[in-house]
From Swiss-Prot:
Protein location: Membrane
Membrane topology: Single-pass membrane protein
Superkingdom field: Bacteria
Major location category of this protein: membrane
Biased composition (Basic and acidic residues): 103-114
Transmembrane segment boundaries: 1-21
Family recorded in the similarity comment: To B.burgdorferi BB0265.
Region (Disordered): 103-130
Alphabetical keyword list: Membrane, Transmembrane, Transmembrane helix
Protein name: Uncharacterized protein TP_0711
Organism: Treponema pallidum (strain Nichols)
Amino acid sequence: MLVMSITFSFVAVALLVYFYVKVRTSFSPDAYAKTMQQEVIKMIRDIRYEADIAVQMLEKKIGECNQVVRTIDRKLTLLNEEILKEHTARTLFRASGAGQETREEVCARPEHRSAPSRAGSSAAKPTPTKRGTIEVYNEKIIRDNGLRAESPLLKDAIIALSEKGLAPEFIAEKTGKPLGEVQLLINLSR
């Protein structure tokens, strides 16, 4: 029995030493540092993973924004070309004097022979000279059919811009036409 108690004593001392070393290493500053280092490494991995996902999403959004910018740039280029064409056409139209007639030409038409003074204003009437039954005026007038003389070109430009997907408000702003007139032209073209 003595042997057994000595054996148990050695086992107890061995267990005591083992648990002492185990507790001392588990709660030592080195153990805390090692545990913290492992947690920091794990957090760094998580942050890198989340950052990679965020960068991929950001790159995707940047690509979409670049596509939208290219589309807008293409539409603005087309719009500038159309505005330049419309401005050139308007300038040529005004320079050629098209759309203007003298009162002599208007009064020479059969439908205007009976009432030559209808087109004149009451403020300052030019003096007519008689040539048979046609009164000749030297003042120039512009035919007015409800729309301006340049409206066929402008109408085509408005319709083309609306077919390209531009908003009626934007078209009205850029062409100088009222919004209602632009919307009417767009709706009539459909």
